Protein backbone atom coordinates (compact mmCIF):
# COMPACT_ATOMS: atom_id res chain seq x y z
CA UNK A 1 0.00 0.00 0.00
CA UNK A 2 1.23 3.50 -0.86
CA UNK A 3 2.61 5.55 2.07
CA UNK A 4 0.12 8.32 1.24
CA UNK A 5 -2.79 5.87 1.67
CA UNK A 6 -1.36 4.63 4.98
CA UNK A 7 -1.07 8.23 6.20
CA UNK A 8 -4.75 8.88 5.37
CA UNK A 9 -5.81 5.68 7.12
CA UNK A 10 -3.79 6.55 10.24
CA UNK A 11 -5.51 9.95 10.39
CA UNK A 12 -8.95 8.34 10.04
CA UNK A 13 -8.15 5.76 12.73
CA UNK A 14 -7.02 8.57 15.05
CA UNK A 15 -10.28 10.45 14.36
CA UNK A 16 -12.24 7.25 15.12
CA UNK A 17 -10.52 6.97 18.52
CA UNK A 18 -11.20 10.68 19.22
CA UNK A 19 -14.89 10.22 18.47
CA UNK A 20 -15.05 7.15 20.70
CA UNK A 21 -13.71 9.24 23.60
CA UNK A 22 -16.12 12.13 22.87
CA UNK A 23 -19.13 9.80 22.72
CA UNK A 24 -18.32 8.53 26.22
CA UNK A 25 -18.17 12.11 27.55
CA UNK A 26 -21.33 13.11 29.53
CA UNK A 27 -21.14 16.64 28.05
CA UNK A 28 -21.45 15.22 24.53
CA UNK A 29 -24.31 12.95 25.55
CA UNK A 30 -26.24 15.96 26.91
CA UNK A 31 -25.99 17.75 23.54
CA UNK A 32 -28.28 15.51 21.48
CA UNK A 33 -27.53 17.13 18.09
CA UNK A 34 -23.74 16.91 18.61
CA UNK A 35 -24.08 13.35 19.91
CA UNK A 36 -26.12 12.37 16.82
CA UNK A 37 -23.62 13.90 14.39
CA UNK A 38 -20.64 12.28 16.12
CA UNK A 39 -22.40 8.91 16.29
CA UNK A 40 -23.02 9.06 12.53
CA UNK A 41 -19.37 9.92 11.81
CA UNK A 42 -18.18 7.21 14.22
CA UNK A 43 -20.33 4.61 12.47
CA UNK A 44 -19.01 5.70 9.05
CA UNK A 45 -15.39 5.33 10.21
CA UNK A 46 -15.81 2.08 12.16
CA UNK A 47 -15.41 -0.24 9.16
CA UNK A 48 -12.26 1.57 7.96
CA UNK A 49 -10.73 1.55 11.46
CA UNK A 50 -11.49 -2.15 11.92
CA UNK A 51 -10.05 -3.18 8.53
CA UNK A 52 -6.97 -0.99 8.98
CA UNK A 53 -6.27 -2.55 12.41
CA UNK A 54 -6.53 -5.98 10.76
CA UNK A 55 -4.20 -4.85 7.93
CA UNK A 56 -1.58 -3.58 10.44
CA UNK A 57 -1.71 -6.92 12.30
CA UNK A 58 -1.07 -8.76 9.02
CA UNK A 59 2.00 -6.59 8.31
CA UNK A 60 3.40 -7.61 11.73
CA UNK A 61 2.54 -11.26 11.02
CA UNK A 62 4.47 -11.08 7.73
CA UNK A 63 7.51 -9.55 9.45
CA UNK A 64 7.42 -12.37 12.03
CA UNK A 65 7.05 -15.03 9.31
CA UNK A 66 9.98 -13.58 7.31
CA UNK A 67 12.22 -13.74 10.39
CA UNK A 68 11.51 -17.48 10.64
CA UNK A 69 12.45 -18.26 7.02
CA UNK A 70 16.13 -18.69 7.99
CA UNK A 71 15.23 -21.46 10.46
CA UNK A 72 15.32 -24.83 8.56
CA UNK A 73 12.80 -26.39 10.94
CA UNK A 74 10.34 -23.47 10.60
CA UNK A 75 10.95 -22.61 6.93
CA UNK A 76 8.04 -24.58 5.43
CA UNK A 77 5.49 -23.37 7.98
CA UNK A 78 6.76 -19.76 7.76
CA UNK A 79 6.52 -19.80 3.92
CA UNK A 80 2.94 -21.05 4.14
CA UNK A 81 2.01 -18.40 6.73
CA UNK A 82 3.68 -15.67 4.68
CA UNK A 83 1.77 -16.57 1.49
CA UNK A 84 -1.51 -16.69 3.37
CA UNK A 85 -0.87 -13.29 5.01
CA UNK A 86 0.12 -11.75 1.63
CA UNK A 87 -3.18 -12.80 0.02
CA UNK A 88 -5.18 -11.48 2.98
CA UNK A 89 -3.18 -8.23 2.97
CA UNK A 90 -3.86 -7.67 -0.76
CA UNK A 91 -7.59 -8.26 -0.23
CA UNK A 92 -7.69 -5.82 2.68
CA UNK A 93 -5.67 -3.24 0.72
CA UNK A 94 -8.25 -3.37 -2.08
CA UNK A 95 -11.14 -2.98 0.39
CA UNK A 96 -9.46 -0.07 2.17
CA UNK A 97 -8.67 1.73 -1.09
CA UNK A 98 -12.33 1.52 -2.10
CA UNK A 99 -13.37 2.88 1.32
CA UNK A 100 -10.97 5.81 0.81
CA UNK A 101 -12.62 6.83 -2.46
CA UNK A 102 -14.38 10.21 -2.42
CA UNK A 103 -18.04 9.81 -1.51
CA UNK A 104 -20.87 11.36 -3.50
CA UNK A 105 -23.21 12.76 -0.84
CA UNK A 106 -26.15 12.23 -3.21
CA UNK A 107 -25.58 8.45 -3.49
CA UNK A 108 -27.50 7.67 -0.30
CA UNK A 109 -30.60 9.61 -1.40
CA UNK A 110 -33.89 8.81 -3.10
CA UNK A 111 -34.25 9.96 -6.69
CA UNK A 112 -36.52 11.28 -9.41
CA UNK A 113 -36.56 9.21 -12.59
CA UNK A 114 -37.62 10.87 -15.84
CA UNK A 115 -38.21 8.88 -19.03
CA UNK A 116 -38.90 10.73 -22.28
CA UNK A 117 -39.75 9.31 -25.70
CA UNK A 118 -37.30 10.56 -28.32
CA UNK A 119 -36.95 9.72 -32.01
CA UNK A 120 -39.24 6.99 -33.29
CA UNK A 121 -42.75 8.33 -32.75
CA UNK A 122 -45.26 5.83 -31.35
CA UNK A 123 -42.63 3.10 -31.00
CA UNK A 124 -40.45 5.41 -28.84
CA UNK A 125 -43.44 6.08 -26.54
CA UNK A 126 -44.15 2.33 -26.30
CA UNK A 127 -40.49 1.69 -25.42
CA UNK A 128 -40.65 4.46 -22.77
CA UNK A 129 -43.47 2.42 -21.21
CA UNK A 130 -41.30 -0.72 -21.35
CA UNK A 131 -38.45 1.13 -19.61
CA UNK A 132 -40.82 2.41 -16.93
CA UNK A 133 -42.01 -1.15 -16.20
CA UNK A 134 -38.39 -2.39 -16.18
CA UNK A 135 -37.44 0.18 -13.51
CA UNK A 136 -40.68 -0.45 -11.57
CA UNK A 137 -39.86 -4.18 -11.37
CA UNK A 138 -36.29 -3.43 -10.31
CA UNK A 139 -37.53 -1.02 -7.62
CA UNK A 140 -39.95 -3.68 -6.36
CA UNK A 141 -37.16 -6.27 -6.18
CA UNK A 142 -35.16 -3.84 -4.00
CA UNK A 143 -38.20 -3.02 -1.80
CA UNK A 144 -38.07 0.61 -2.92
CA UNK A 145 -41.21 2.72 -3.11
CA UNK A 146 -42.15 4.08 -6.55
CA UNK A 147 -44.56 6.98 -6.95
CA UNK A 148 -45.77 8.56 -10.20
CA UNK A 149 -45.32 12.34 -10.26
CA UNK A 150 -46.48 13.01 -13.81
CA UNK A 151 -47.30 10.91 -16.88
CA UNK A 152 -48.25 11.79 -20.44
CA UNK A 153 -49.55 8.80 -22.37
CA UNK A 154 -48.62 8.07 -25.99
CA UNK A 155 -51.40 7.88 -28.56
CA UNK A 156 -50.84 4.15 -29.17
CA UNK A 157 -49.62 3.11 -25.72
CA UNK A 158 -46.61 3.81 -23.56
CA UNK A 159 -45.66 7.32 -22.49
CA UNK A 160 -44.39 10.47 -24.14
CA UNK A 161 -43.02 11.42 -20.72
CA UNK A 162 -43.04 9.78 -17.31
CA UNK A 163 -41.68 11.24 -14.07
CA UNK A 164 -41.53 9.07 -10.95
CA UNK A 165 -40.01 9.34 -7.50
CA UNK A 166 -38.19 6.26 -6.19
CA UNK A 167 -37.69 6.27 -2.42
CA UNK A 168 -35.25 4.16 -0.44
CA UNK A 169 -31.73 4.08 0.98
CA UNK A 170 -29.04 4.45 -1.69
CA UNK A 171 -31.44 4.62 -4.65
CA UNK A 172 -29.60 7.40 -6.51
CA UNK A 173 -26.22 5.68 -6.07
CA UNK A 174 -27.60 2.54 -7.71
CA UNK A 175 -29.48 4.22 -10.55
CA UNK A 176 -27.40 7.29 -11.46
CA UNK A 177 -25.66 5.55 -14.37
CA UNK A 178 -29.05 4.98 -16.03
CA UNK A 179 -29.07 8.63 -17.15
CA UNK A 180 -28.57 9.12 -20.88
CA UNK A 181 -29.79 7.78 -24.20
CA UNK A 182 -31.46 4.35 -24.41
CA UNK A 183 -31.92 2.98 -27.94
CA UNK A 184 -34.22 0.12 -28.98
CA UNK A 185 -33.99 -2.00 -32.12
CA UNK A 186 -37.02 -4.19 -32.85
CA UNK A 187 -39.95 -4.82 -35.20
CA UNK A 188 -42.85 -2.61 -34.08
CA UNK A 189 -46.28 -4.25 -33.76
CA UNK A 190 -47.53 -1.82 -36.42
CA UNK A 191 -44.83 -2.91 -38.92
CA UNK A 192 -46.46 -5.16 -41.56
CA UNK A 193 -43.27 -6.06 -43.49
CA UNK A 194 -41.23 -7.20 -40.50
CA UNK A 195 -38.60 -4.47 -40.76
CA UNK A 196 -36.51 -3.60 -37.71
CA UNK A 197 -36.92 0.00 -36.55
CA UNK A 198 -34.60 1.98 -34.29
CA UNK A 199 -36.18 4.26 -31.69
CA UNK A 200 -34.80 6.09 -28.68
CA UNK A 201 -35.71 7.35 -25.23
CA UNK A 202 -33.83 9.53 -22.81
CA UNK A 203 -33.57 8.81 -19.10
CA UNK A 204 -32.62 11.31 -16.40
CA UNK A 205 -31.94 10.24 -12.80
CA UNK A 206 -31.75 13.09 -10.27
CA UNK A 207 -31.23 12.86 -6.50
CA UNK A 208 -34.01 14.11 -4.25
CA UNK A 209 -32.46 17.09 -2.46
CA UNK A 210 -33.51 17.98 1.13
CA UNK A 211 -35.43 21.26 1.26
CA UNK A 212 -32.67 23.06 3.18
CA UNK A 213 -30.11 22.17 0.47
CA UNK A 214 -32.22 23.09 -2.56
CA UNK A 215 -30.99 25.87 -4.86
CA UNK A 216 -32.55 29.19 -3.89
CA UNK A 217 -35.74 29.72 -5.89
CA UNK A 218 -37.24 33.22 -5.96
CA UNK A 219 -41.03 33.20 -6.32
CA UNK A 220 -40.88 36.11 -8.76
CA UNK A 221 -38.85 33.83 -11.07
CA UNK A 222 -41.75 31.35 -11.28
CA UNK A 223 -44.83 31.23 -13.47
CA UNK A 224 -47.43 28.88 -11.98
CA UNK A 225 -50.31 27.66 -14.16
CA UNK A 226 -53.18 25.42 -13.08
CA UNK A 227 -55.17 23.09 -15.32
CA UNK A 228 -57.41 20.03 -15.14
CA UNK A 229 -55.59 16.73 -14.90
CA UNK A 230 -56.39 13.87 -17.22
CA UNK A 231 -54.88 10.56 -18.30
CA UNK A 232 -52.30 8.53 -16.45
CA UNK A 233 -50.89 10.22 -13.42
CA UNK A 234 -54.33 11.73 -12.91
CA UNK A 235 -56.48 8.76 -13.91
CA UNK A 236 -59.46 10.36 -12.22
CA UNK A 237 -60.43 13.12 -14.69
CA UNK A 238 -60.64 16.13 -12.41
CA UNK A 239 -63.41 18.68 -12.49
CA UNK A 240 -61.19 21.19 -10.66
CA UNK A 241 -57.94 22.82 -11.76
CA UNK A 242 -55.74 20.77 -9.41
CA UNK A 243 -52.90 20.03 -11.85
CA UNK A 244 -49.89 22.35 -11.68
CA UNK A 245 -47.37 23.55 -14.24
CA UNK A 246 -44.40 25.53 -12.89
CA UNK A 247 -42.03 27.39 -15.22
CA UNK A 248 -38.71 28.67 -13.87
CA UNK A 249 -38.31 31.75 -16.07
CA UNK A 250 -34.50 32.28 -15.81
CA UNK A 251 -33.69 28.70 -16.92
CA UNK A 252 -36.82 27.76 -18.86
CA UNK A 253 -37.24 24.57 -16.80
CA UNK A 254 -40.88 23.41 -16.85
CA UNK A 255 -42.35 20.90 -14.39
CA UNK A 256 -45.88 19.51 -14.36
CA UNK A 257 -47.61 17.47 -11.68
CA UNK A 258 -51.15 16.15 -11.90
CA UNK A 259 -51.05 12.97 -9.85
CA UNK A 260 -52.81 14.25 -6.73
CA UNK A 261 -56.36 15.54 -6.31
CA UNK A 262 -55.00 18.36 -4.17
CA UNK A 263 -53.51 21.39 -5.92
CA UNK A 264 -51.35 22.04 -2.83
CA UNK A 265 -49.84 18.51 -2.98
CA UNK A 266 -49.23 18.77 -6.73
CA UNK A 267 -47.46 22.10 -6.23
CA UNK A 268 -45.24 20.68 -3.47
CA UNK A 269 -44.25 17.73 -5.68
CA UNK A 270 -43.60 19.98 -8.69
CA UNK A 271 -41.39 22.29 -6.59
CA UNK A 272 -39.42 19.27 -5.37
CA UNK A 273 -38.82 18.11 -8.97
CA UNK A 274 -37.89 21.68 -10.01
CA UNK A 275 -35.29 21.87 -7.24
CA UNK A 276 -33.88 18.48 -8.26
CA UNK A 277 -33.63 19.59 -11.91
CA UNK A 278 -31.86 22.82 -10.97
CA UNK A 279 -29.42 20.86 -8.77
CA UNK A 280 -28.91 18.41 -11.67
CA UNK A 281 -28.11 21.31 -14.01
CA UNK A 282 -25.38 22.47 -11.61
CA UNK A 283 -24.00 18.92 -11.39
CA UNK A 284 -24.05 18.65 -15.20
CA UNK A 285 -21.72 21.64 -15.46
CA UNK A 286 -19.24 19.85 -13.19
CA UNK A 287 -19.60 16.61 -15.20
CA UNK A 288 -18.89 18.41 -18.47
CA UNK A 289 -15.68 19.78 -16.95
CA UNK A 290 -14.71 16.32 -15.65
CA UNK A 291 -15.58 14.63 -18.96
CA UNK A 292 -13.09 16.90 -20.75
CA UNK A 293 -10.37 15.90 -18.26
CA UNK A 294 -10.91 12.15 -18.10
CA UNK A 295 -13.38 9.44 -18.98
CA UNK A 296 -16.58 9.77 -17.00
CA UNK A 297 -19.19 6.99 -16.96
CA UNK A 298 -21.89 9.57 -16.36
CA UNK A 299 -20.82 11.18 -19.62
CA UNK A 300 -21.28 14.90 -20.00
CA UNK A 301 -24.73 14.67 -18.41
CA UNK A 302 -26.29 15.31 -21.82
CA UNK A 303 -29.52 13.37 -22.32
CA UNK A 304 -28.47 12.56 -25.89
CA UNK A 305 -25.42 10.55 -24.78
CA UNK A 306 -26.02 7.08 -26.24
CA UNK A 307 -25.42 4.76 -23.34
CA UNK A 308 -27.34 1.58 -24.02
CA UNK A 309 -28.90 -0.39 -26.90
CA UNK A 310 -31.66 -2.99 -26.50
CA UNK A 311 -31.77 -5.28 -29.56
CA UNK A 312 -34.89 -7.47 -29.36
CA UNK A 313 -34.35 -9.73 -32.44
CA UNK A 314 -30.97 -10.80 -31.01
CA UNK A 315 -32.08 -10.75 -27.35
CA UNK A 316 -29.07 -8.51 -26.75
CA UNK A 317 -28.39 -5.51 -24.53
CA UNK A 318 -25.18 -3.49 -24.92
CA UNK A 319 -23.83 -0.82 -22.60
CA UNK A 320 -21.54 1.25 -24.84
CA UNK A 321 -19.71 3.00 -21.98
CA UNK A 322 -17.96 -0.16 -20.83
CA UNK A 323 -18.37 -2.27 -24.01
CA UNK A 324 -20.53 -4.77 -22.14
CA UNK A 325 -22.81 -7.00 -24.25
CA UNK A 326 -25.20 -9.51 -22.67
CA UNK A 327 -27.62 -11.84 -24.45
CA UNK A 328 -30.00 -11.66 -21.50
CA UNK A 329 -32.47 -9.02 -22.70
CA UNK A 330 -35.54 -10.81 -21.28
CA UNK A 331 -33.99 -10.79 -17.80
CA UNK A 332 -33.08 -7.10 -18.07
CA UNK A 333 -36.56 -6.06 -19.23
CA UNK A 334 -38.08 -8.08 -16.36
CA UNK A 335 -36.17 -5.87 -13.90
CA UNK A 336 -32.97 -7.85 -13.28
CA UNK A 337 -30.84 -4.75 -13.74
CA UNK A 338 -28.02 -5.66 -11.37
CA UNK A 339 -26.31 -7.58 -14.21
CA UNK A 340 -25.82 -4.17 -15.88
CA UNK A 341 -25.56 -1.90 -12.83
CA UNK A 342 -22.89 -3.85 -10.91
CA UNK A 343 -20.31 -3.86 -13.76
CA UNK A 344 -20.86 -0.10 -14.16
CA UNK A 345 -20.32 0.49 -10.43
CA UNK A 346 -17.14 -1.63 -10.47
CA UNK A 347 -15.82 0.30 -13.48
CA UNK A 348 -16.65 3.58 -11.73
CA UNK A 349 -14.70 2.48 -8.64
CA UNK A 350 -11.73 1.53 -10.84
CA UNK A 351 -11.82 4.96 -12.50
CA UNK A 352 -11.91 6.70 -9.11
CA UNK A 353 -8.99 4.59 -7.83
CA UNK A 354 -7.00 5.46 -10.95
CA UNK A 355 -7.75 9.18 -10.47
CA UNK A 356 -6.80 8.92 -6.77
CA UNK A 357 -3.46 7.31 -7.68
CA UNK A 358 -2.76 10.05 -10.24
CA UNK A 359 -3.20 12.68 -7.53
CA UNK A 360 -0.59 11.08 -5.28
From Swiss-Prot:
Keywords, ordered alphabetically: Cytoplasm, Methylation, Protein biosynthesis
GO molecular function (one): translation release factor activity, codon specific
Modification after translation: Methylated by PrmC. Methylation increases the termination efficiency of RF1.
InterPro entries: PCRF, Pep_chain_release_fac_I, Pep_chain_release_fac_I_sf, Prokaryotic/Mito_RF, RF-1
Keyword tRNA-binding: no
Location in the cell: Cytoplasm
A GO CC term attached to the entry: cytoplasm
Residue span of region Disordered: 285-311
HAMAP family per UniProt: Rel_fac_1
Name this polypeptide is given: Peptide chain release factor 1
GN (gene name): prfA
Amino acid sequence: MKPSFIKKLEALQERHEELQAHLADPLTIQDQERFRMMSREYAQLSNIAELFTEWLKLQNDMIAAKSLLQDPEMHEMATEELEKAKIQSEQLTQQLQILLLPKDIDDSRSCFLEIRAGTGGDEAAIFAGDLFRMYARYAESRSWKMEIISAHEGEHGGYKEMITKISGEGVYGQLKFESGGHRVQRVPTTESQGRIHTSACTVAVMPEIPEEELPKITLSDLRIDTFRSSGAGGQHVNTTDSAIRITHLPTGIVVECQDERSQHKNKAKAMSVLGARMHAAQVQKRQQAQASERRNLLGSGDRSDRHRTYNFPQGRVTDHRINLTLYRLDEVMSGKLDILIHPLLREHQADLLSALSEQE
